[in-house]
Amino acid sequence: MELSYRRAQLLELSRILAQCFENVNRYEDFARVDRSEALSAVRRRVQKQIFNFTIAEKDGEAVGCYFLHNVNGRVELEEFYVFDPHRGRGIGTQMLRDCQSKVNGAIWLRVYAGNVRAIGFYIRLGFHICGEAGNGMLWMQCI
């Protein structure tokens, strides 16, 4: 299965936001964080960066997206999603390999501590947990 990659377009904003909101709603601890503020912050960040997201396509259909960028001299994978119903088919592995091919050095990411499936995925692909990132999240790194 071959994936192709391109920059996101404005018309994909709602789909990317839906994935981000699903993740926040599932794993965020709303006892510590105001839900509407958390979702508003996600919306602002994604709207600002939409054209920096990479869309993965299979046979012309968008199957996932990621946002890889430099933060204070460190490469971070800030968002990474395989769209339903394409999960569990090796697409995430191919997408992460694409991210790794674009970086000379370490990739950092934050993941919700409760997102056991994602943590396992990242560990299988060479990431390790480096510590807490705050707000119920963990830092992970792959060199």
Residue ranges and their predicted role:
Residues E2-S4:
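Extreme N-terminal starter segment of soluble prokaryotic enzymes
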Residues R7-E79, F83-D84, L96-D98, K102, ...:
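Acetyl-CoA-dependent GNAT
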Residues F83-P85, R89, A113-G114:
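Active-site acidic-Proline motif in GNAT/NAT acetyltransferases
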Residues G88-L96:
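Glycine-rich acyl-CoA binding loop
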Residues T93-Q94, G114-E132, L138:
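Conserved active-site alpha-helix within GNAT-family acetyltransferase domains
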Residues K102-A113:
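Conserved GNAT acetyl-CoA-binding A-motif
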Residues Q141-I143:
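Terminal substrate-recognition subdomain of acyl/acetyltransferases
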